[in-house]
């Protein structure tokens, strides 16, 4: 795939060095183009790209509350439809907290109503903007400020909420998982979402150097390691048909992924083995 050179997210924003969210937004907007309206919930992306009076966005952009990105995007879509404008893409960007927790009700409603919008969840697996608190998307065993490891706790004790399958259960015509570390796979999925008649949901996995604890130069490498170990699986569901879009030639041990991050370094060998067993069971079910 030839990646367009034009940028719709300007450099000079205030993202952390190695920020994965901005990589994802840049790639998505290269596919969607200038005829796009973006809606962004409160979160990392909003804070780093629009410190008043500055903005890094080169397209129309709307900042909304933590919980209602999907609702506002659906309103924008209906307004454009009323004006006879079918040439404008409407995309919502929200983090995992604004998607799996606070914004789930609005997202569910927008998907169920069938609005012609694209919703991209940039998942860094915690509330990174407000202090690295756990979310429903925080993986089992991860240490956060509200699920810390210590004498009484080993970190997050709940499994990661499966948002893509929840969206698929709504009958959404296009649902996909993606990773910033596999840009062509992600951009192809954005293209399919753009061409979908109806709502589309993409769950984008993006390493967070601040919250996960790793070298900022290793963001893309760590994202690849998540996929190569089976900790994050790339797939799409088109009109109910499930397809894995990338299969590692030989899966690496999950321990390689866990050991590369500070948030998992407290885990015992027994706990790591338990995580490996879970990953193995999921991969076996999907024949990866």
UniProtKB/Swiss-Prot annotation:
Cofactor binding mode and count: Binds 1 [4Fe-4S] cluster per subunit.
GO molecular function, one term: thiamine pyrophosphate binding
Polar residues biased stretches: 137-148
Signal sequence extent: none
Disulfide bonds: none
EC number per UniProt: 1.2.7.1
Keywords: 4Fe-4S, Iron, Iron-sulfur, Metal-binding, Oxidoreductase
Basic and acidic residues compositional bias, start-end: 149-159
Cofactor(s) annotated in UniProt: [4Fe-4S] cluster
InterPro entries, A to Z: PorB-like, THDP-binding, TPP_enzyme_TPP-bd
Catalytic activity: 2 oxidized [2Fe-2S]-[ferredoxin] + pyruvate + CoA = 2 reduced [2Fe-2S]-[ferredoxin] + acetyl-CoA + CO2 + H(+)
Protein name per Swiss-Prot or TrEMBL: Pyruvate synthase subunit PorB
Organism of derivation: Methanothermobacter thermautotrophicus (strain ATCC 29096 / DSM 1053 / JCM 10044 / NBRC 100330 / Delta H) (Methanobacterium thermoautotrophicum)
Gene: porB
């Amino acid at each position: 795939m030839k990646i367009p050179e034009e940028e719709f997210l300007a450099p000079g924003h205030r993202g952390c060095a190695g920020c994965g969210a901005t990589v994802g937004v840049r790639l998505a907007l290269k596919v969607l183009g200038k005829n796009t309206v973006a809606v962004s919930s409160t979160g990392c992306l909003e804070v780093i790209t629009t410190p008043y009076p500055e903005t890094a966005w080169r397209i129309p952009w709307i900042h909304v509350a933590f919980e209602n990105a999907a609702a506002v995007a659906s309103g924008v879509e209906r307004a454009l439809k009323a004006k006879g404008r079918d040439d404008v893409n409407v995309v919502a960007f929200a983090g995992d907290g604004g998607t799996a927790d606070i914004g789930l009700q609005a997202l569910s409603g927008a998907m169920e109503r069938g609005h012609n919008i694209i919703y991209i969840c940039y998942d860094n697996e915690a509330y990174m903007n407000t202090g690295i608190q756990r979310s429903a998307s925080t993986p089992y065993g991860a240490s956060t400020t509200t699920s810390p490891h210590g004498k009484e706790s080993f970190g997050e004790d709940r499994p990661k909420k499966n948002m893509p399958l929840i969206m698929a259960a709504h009958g959404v015509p296009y649902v996909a998982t993606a990773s910033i570390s596999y840009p062509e796979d992600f951009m192809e999925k954005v293209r399919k979402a753009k061409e979908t008649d109806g709502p589309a949901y993409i769950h984008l996995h993006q390493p967070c150097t601040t919250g996960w604890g790793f070298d900022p130069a290793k963001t893309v490498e760590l994202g690849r390691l998540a996929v190569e170990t089976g900790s994050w699986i790339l797939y799409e569901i088109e009109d109910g048909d499930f397809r894995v879009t990338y299969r590692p030639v030989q899966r690496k041990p999950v321990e390689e992924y866990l050991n590369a991050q500070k948030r998992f370094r407290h885990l015992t060998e027994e706990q790591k083995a338990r995580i490996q067993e879970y990953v193995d069971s999921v991969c076996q079910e999907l024949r990866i």
